[in-house]
Amino acid sequence: IFYAIVFFFSIQIAFSQSLPEVTLDQAWKDKIRALAPEKATFPAKKKNFLVFSLHTGFNHWVIPHTEEMIKILGENSGAFTVTGSKDITEFEAKNLKKYDAVILNNTCSIGDHRNLFWDKLKENTSVDSATSMKKALELEANLLSYVEKGGGLLVLHGGVTTLNNSWDFSRLLGASFDYHPKQQAIQVRLEDANHPLVQAFPADGFNHVDEPYFYKNAYAELDFKPLLYFNNSEIESQRKGQELTEGKTYVAWIRAEGRGKVMYISPSHNAQSFENPDLLQFYLDGMQYVAGDVECDETPIKKN
């Protein structure tokens, strides 16, 4: 209760402004460990996760904090073994087989193709661009096949931009990134308070400072089961000409793809958000979902 009160008031103070970077030290790790769940919600066999944290585009300062938070969730609960990497060879088909699920941790791409694999491969100037692009497409295909055959995929915040111009990836995930207004306090609400994956939260959701993401491409198809959202009318500084004054934009969702499970969680740009134990529980439950440990309603809303 004490942490929840402190968290609430810190959010109010920081309203409509960016939060300062947090030092990733032992004190911060200890704080998160004390707040993290001590057991898994859905008892299951221990699973292996890859948390992939390479960025070629925007460098979210929260990347190392997010990776550490994921590792703490695995250790505290005993539900997961977590391997961290920035090596794109992890997306070779033989290497993906080592993991029950993959987490894309703010894996922002950049440049003309908005393709993380291409961005990294083109650094090797001894290989021509056509060969590099062929390899990039191969790694993307490996990821799609991995999920189709039963692997899990959890994409966090800026990870939505990993392959931002790829319609195949957009359909797999359920969206591509369009833009975000300034950081601000956001009231995140529950789409269905009875869904098993949102039981960590109170009925009215939670408030935190974050970038409110808006989406494009496959998002318009709404081929996913939404979990969290914000009201568009509450978001300040929207892009001129694209202002949304009605309806909602989803913040987290799930979808089945073949035998695999996919989840997107937008929170958060800021490590301060992880000081909310409810959000840590949501992350842990989401990891269990993509690992195949949770039976729940995945029915997509689909826009007709």
Where does each model-flagged region fall?
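Bacterial Sec-dependent N-terminal signal peptides
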Residues: I1-S18
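Extracellular ligand-binding/catalytic regions of CAZymes and related secreted enzymes
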Residues: S18-A44, P64, I72-S77, I235-E236, ...
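Catalytic beta-strand/loop cores that center a nucleophilic Ser/Cys/Thr
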Residues: W28-P37, R171, A175-G258
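Short beta-strand segments enriched in small/hydrophobic residues
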Residues: K46-G57
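Short alpha-beta junction capping motif
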Residues: F49-L50, L96-L163, R259
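Solvent-exposed loop/turn segments at secondary-structure junctions
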Residues: H55-F58, I88-E90, T107-G111, L153, ...
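Glycine- and acidic-residue-enriched helix-capping/strand-helix junction motifs
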Residues: T56-E68
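A short, well-structured beta->alpha microelement
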Residues: G78-A93
